[in-house]
Amino acid sequence: MFVTQDIVLRLFFRKKKILNNGFSIPKNSSIILAPTHRSRWDGLVLTMAMGRRVTKNDCRFMVTKSEMRGIQGWFLKRLGCFSINQLSPSLSALRYAIDLIEKGEQLVVFPEGKINRYGKKLVLKEGLYRLARLAAKKTTAITIIPIGIAYSKIPPNFRGEFCLSFGKPIPINDYSNFTIKDFNKFLNEKMTQEEEKALKNVGR
């Protein structure tokens, strides 16, 4: 998978930038990555920046059932993706996600729930916070990391640029008294801040 990832990214994109903003993964913490979702390229560029070669852990993506069909589904499985029904998530899918978090895997959840093109305000679904609170019953040290992903063009163009900006880790237990609405507003602000940094670095 590393070879496929390297070849595809190097051939398609001319330049990459990663803004870690002093970012470091908290020790002994289970990680949930919360990136903006602008393109089908997001999974590949995020794996490059936060995958096994960088963090010693794979990125495991939670995606919609429709995204796991056909050739795209085959490729997503190779990236470490698994599907969930957004309207009616099964207990087995939720248990699987919680088990990944408990084992210390890096779970990737796109809080917007779908690809959201530029020019549209971020609207976050309720699933991420619900999942994090459920997982917190199994393991107390859960950290959400807001991430902004930007491309020089949308849709990403051949020999274009991309940038990832990592925000300050958010310990979920520090916000256990938040309502879903309040937490989503807070996370929305953090993701937007990181996306704005990433956009600036690709000339947008």
Regions found by a protein language model. Give the residues of each.
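Alpha-helical membrane-targeting segments
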Residues: 1-15, 69-79, 157
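A cross-taxonomic marker for long C-terminal extensions/tails that follow the last structured domain
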Residues: 177, 181-204
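Catalytic-site beta-strand/loop segments enriched in glycine and acidic/polar residues
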Residues: 100-129
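Catalytic core of membrane glycerolipid acyltransferases/transacylases, capturing the structured
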Residues: 26-88
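Helix-adjacent hinge/juxtasegments
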Residues: 82-103
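Residue-level preference for the first positions of well-ordered beta-strands
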Residues: 30-32, 104-110, 143-145
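A cross-family acyltransferase "interaction/gating" segment
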Residues: 119-181, 186
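Helix-to-loop junction immediately C-terminal to a conserved catalytic motif
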Residues: 5-37
